[in-house]
Curated annotation (Swiss-Prot):
Binding site for Mg(2+): E46, N119, E122
Gene this protein is translated from: rnc
Species this chain originates from: Rickettsia peacockii (strain Rustic)
Catalysed reactions, semicolon-separated: Endonucleolytic cleavage to 5'-phosphomonoester
Single GO biological process annotation from the record: mRNA processing
Enzyme Commission (EC) number: 3.1.26.3
Compartment(s): Cytoplasm
Protein name: Ribonuclease 3
Pfam families: dsrm, Ribonucleas_3_3
Native organism taxonomy: Bacteria, Pseudomonadati, Pseudomonadota, Alphaproteobacteria, Rickettsiales
Length: 227
């Protein structure tokens, strides 16, 4: 496990209360460990972090996407707070290297488990909020999510809906998605999905089936636009 100083440097934030940071990175498996004296883990912080993230992302979208209606804003927010996006933020922070877990959880692939990375990322947001204030937390979230927020094309946010709307407008049957390959261990699988609309088809990969479906839809939309 790497030192917390590196993580704080990536966040551009130094915790005043280091115990909050430790709690945010403590996996629930530690509660079953006889040598672990503290009963705190990241589950309660994750609950708070989820709410803080939704609030901040909603405010950012409301401010930056003035011409988008409620439905489109909801689609973008759904993309920005989904497991895949949160895990990509966690990956930028190399958060898997900092999660405190039992040896058994680590051997079982806990460091690459997307649920663990998502939960720890949300817990970290809550820890920053409790250690500072909503303004500081807002600035950190806006920085970490910047590359995802700046995407203006709704196709990139919700490619499956965009592909479905294209199919309906073109009088085609709705897109059909089929899982064609699964590789890797159960805790770190890569899925390949094939999407087909009429005579058009394209594949996409991802660490979750939904992510693979979105990537397949996005690839097919890009192909249709270039044909």
């Amino acid at each position: 496990m790497e030192s917390f100083e590196k993580l704080e440097k990536l966040l551009s934030y130094s915790f005043k209360n280091k115990e909050l940071l430790i709690e945010a990175l403590s996996h629930p498996s530690l509660r079953q460990h006889h040598e672990y004296k503290d009963d705190k883990d990241y589950e309660r912080l994750e609950f708070l972090g989820d709410a803080v993230l939704n609030l901040v992302i909603t405010e950012i979208l409301f401010r930056n996407f003035a011409n988008y209606n409620e439905g489109n804003l909801a689609k973008i927010r759904s993309y920005l707070v989904c497991k895949e996006t949160i895990c990509m933020v966690g990956a930028k922070l190399t958060l898997k290297n900092y999660i405190i877990m039992t040896h058994g959880e680590e051997v079982a692939g806990g460091r690459d488990n997307l649920n663990n990375i998502e939960n720890a990322t949300e817990a970290l947001i809550a820890a920053i909020y409790l250690d500072s204030n909503i303004e500081t937390t807002h600035d950190i979230i806006e920085k970490l999510w910047a590359e995802f927020i700046k995407v203006q094309n709704l196709t990139d946010y919700d490619p499956k809906t965009a592909l479905q709307e294209w199919a309906q407008a073109s009088d085609h049957h709705l897109p059909i998605y089929r899982l064609i390959k699964r590789e890797g261990a159960s805790h770190a699988s890569t899925f390949t999905v094939l999407v087909k609309v009429k005579d058009y088809e394209q594949t996409g990969t991802g660490h979750a089936i939904k992510e693979a479906e979105k990537n397949a839809a996005r690839s097919l939309l890009h192909r249709l636009k270039n044909d």
